[in-house]
A protein has these predicted regions:
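Trp- and acidic/polar-enriched beta-sheet ligand-binding modules for extracellular glycan
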Residues: 153, 179-262
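Beta-strand-rich modules
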Residues: 63-96
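Pro/Thr/Ser/Gly-rich low-complexity, intrinsically disordered linker/stalk tracts
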Residues: 1-33, 88-113, 250-253
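A short beta-strand element within beta-rich, extracytoplasmic domains
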Residues: 165-177, 230
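Disordered, acidic Ser/Thr/Pro-rich linker "stalks" and the adjacent N-terminal cap
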Residues: 96-162, 175-180, 250-262
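Short beta-strand segments within Ig-like beta-sandwich modules, predominantly Fibronectin type-III
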Residues: 51-58, 206-208
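Structural beta-strand segments of beta-rich domains
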Residues: 20-24, 155-157, 166-168
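Solvent-exposed loop/turn segments flanking beta-strands in beta-repeat/beta-sandwich domains
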Residues: 22-50, 180-184
């Protein structure tokens, strides 16, 4: 189109507030007189002008990396013809949805877990003592009771710490052969060893293979605790027992990035 360009009316534009984004939608009359539009706004985070070019056939534009805390964003629409001649600009205001905070974790120091800190509710009497979980030998193993009488799941490994912890990660390695690893875990904490609180369920992502290793994501218990249980609620193969080669627990560092409150 080479005639005089005319920008669409403000009434033709609607907006959607999305998490950390604004979606602009508009209609274009059938008799529109332009070839393309420029849609510009000033980013309040750095005061830089951002310009997007859209064709006459475009009907929507997603503006990402926006924040609700900035309130109104002012968008300037301006039509152009094929000769890059500009029509009169038009402005509309729109707001962003709230950008959720992001949380990341990094592994900290390994906690010194010794055999006397470990216990279970279902030790196999003939082999696989729980102390093997911290002996550093990948070919030894801990085993809950496979001999008769078997105890149905859930079954647990308990760690009684010598000091309080709150943000942590755990790691384990499956047995080398004849492995029966956890498929589902319930992570529980306590401060007296009698009253327990579930803080996380892990229902996917655990490994089934021989010698496979698993490192949990960071877990924030929400408060300090001195006792930890890894409660196995389901095993691969739906057995009434499980085994592991090694177990370790780490303190973890939690970082919260919340630009809406910076």
């Amino acid at each position: 189109y080479t005639g005089a360009p005319k920008t669409i009316d403000a009434s033709a534009v609607t907006s959607e507030a999305l998490p950390g984004a604004i979606r602009l939608n508009w209609t274009v009359p059938a008799d529109s007189t332009f070839s393309y539009m420029k849609i510009s706004y000033v980013n309040p985070a750095n005061q830089e002008t951002v310009t997007n070019v859209v064709s006459i056939h475009t009907r929507t534009l997603l503006i990402e990396n926006t924040l609700k805390k900035y309130g109104d964003y002012t968008f300037t629409f301006q039509a152009f013809n094929d000769k890059n001649e500009a029509g009169a600009p038009m402005q509309v205001k729109a707001q962003s949805g709230l950008l959720p905070a992001t949380v990341t974790y990094s592994k900290g120091d390994k906690i010194n877990v010794t055999a006397d800190m470990l216990s279970t509710d279902d030790q196999e009497p003939s082999e696989g003592p729980i102390k093997n979980l911290v002996d550093g030998n990948y070919n030894s193993f801990f085993h809950t009771r496979w001999s008769s009488p078997q105890k149905p799941l859930p079954q647990y490994i308990q760690v009684d710490f010598k000091e309080a912890h709150q943000v942590f990660m755990f790691w384990y390695r499956n047995r080398n052969g004849s492995q029966v690893g956890p498929e589902n875990l319930d992570i529980q904490i306590s401060n007296d060893g009698d009253n327990w609180e579930s803080i996380k369920e892990i229902l996917s992502g655990l490994p089934s293979a021989s010698q496979a290793e698993y490192t949990s994501e960071g877990i924030d218990a929400g408060k300090p605790f001195t006792h930890l249980r890894l409660v196995v609620t389901k095993t691969f193969g739906d057995r009434n027992y499980f085994n592991l080669a090694e177990l370790a627990v780490f303190d973890a560092h939690k970082v919260v990035y919340d630009p809406e409150n910076e």
